[in-house]
Amino acid sequence: LKPAAAQEGLAGPYLAARHASFAREFQTASKYLEQVVGEDSSNIDAMETLILSKIALGVFEDVYPIADRIVDDGVDSQVAHVALITRAVRVQDFKTLVAQLDAQKGIGHQVVDGLLLAWANVGAGDVQTAFAIMDGLKDQEPSQGLVSYHRALIHHVMGNFESAEAIFKDIGQQAGALSRRAVIVRLQSLMAQNEFNQAEAVLEKYFGENLDPELLDMQDDIKASRMPNERLIGSVADGIAEVFFAIAKALSSEAQDEYSLMHARVAELLSSEHVEAILLAANVLENMGQYEL
């Protein structure tokens, strides 16, 4: 007897797709999965794996119709939800994003979904609701630092630099609580207030003489009392990218490579200058042996 896959049906492409997925060969997996999904629109597993594979390749436009199909079928799919969150942010349709997250169609983590909903409300023009959501999250351990950081970022994006600095100063009392990115945003908040002497002191405190080219440029701006050309976090999309980057970092430490890569790719898409997200994605791909991606 001939193998079933050689006779007819989708067993061959499906098995080939699974093999490619396990081998982290995303291009090959996508090719076979598109064939499976094209002929069997009820195969949720294949659709979710196709979304993961496409996002791993940095291809987003193809995944939105697939994600719509999954959600329209009433399936609770984190992968599909991530795709639709990405689309809403890209087109700045924050009211749709608020509705999606209010309907519990997010990541499935209370703090993460709360942060996304807060940012979505900022984008929709309802900052009061955003901060009310933040208030409900502030006692969540061990995420207090993350919530405070995003509260500071919202103030920063809104141009409330004094409020942002007050929060950064408070977070900074805890050893190691501010990441490099957080310190840079704090410096830019101080510079926006013309607090260049304080900015110089903060730069010295956190980095000392160990300055890379980016920090040397920032030091030059501080000494010349001028604002940098652009802010590291300057929009709602940048803020949401920061949420996805935090997830990617957490997942990378747990060796969940496909999901870490997905969230890093989203951060990279939403904030094109997000160097850390680009480097994290590259590191995950290197660990997978996918050097060409």
Task: Enumerate the language-model features and the residues they cover.
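Conserved small-residue packing positions in alpha-helical repeats and bundles
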Residues: 17, 51, 85-88, 118, ...
